[in-house]
Amino acid sequence: MKEQTEVGKLKEGKYLLVDDEPCKILSISVSKPGKHGAAKARLDVVGIFDGVKRSIVQPVSAKVYAPIVERRNAQVISIAGNVVQMMDLESFENFEVTVTDDVKDRIEAGKETMYIYSMEKRKIDFL
């Protein structure tokens, strides 16, 4: 799910869709409007799920999409290799998430953890 917004209304720490990937905004710099053009905004973002840094330049009045990012709670059912099977505590839906070794060391079966859900993707989140 996504919603439309203007580049000028975005703030650091919010989310933005870049190349159909939900990204967190790290920094925004806005140039002054010139004699023959509108103000431009440079956004430095990092992908939530892939960790890739991206940079885009858009006019401040341009329309962009902001993904709806939800933080939900789930119970870890089992851990097999780098795949963690989890159950959402609200909808009782079972799903699998691929994790890295450092995340795998911080979770254990039977415990509750928080995860990020956006654009039909999931990732375990530690605050």
UniProtKB/Swiss-Prot annotation:
Subcellular location: Cytoplasm
Domain of life: Archaea
Main location: cytoplasm
PROSITE patterns the record matches: IF5A_HYPUSINE
GO annotation, biological process: positive regulation of translational elongation; positive regulation of translational termination
Hypusine carried by residues: 35
GO molecular function: ribosome binding; RNA binding; translation elongation factor activity; translation initiation factor activity
Keywords: Cytoplasm, Hypusine, Initiation factor, Protein biosynthesis
GO annotation, cellular component aspect: cytoplasm
Keyword Repeat: no
CDD domains: S1_aIF5A
Function statement: Functions by promoting the formation of the first peptide bond.
Family: Belongs to the eIF-5A family.
Cross-referenced PANTHER family: TRANSLATION INITIATION FACTOR 5A FAMILY MEMBER
NCBIfam families (UniProt xref): eIF_5A, PRK03999.1
Protein's name according to its UniProt entry: Translation initiation factor 5A
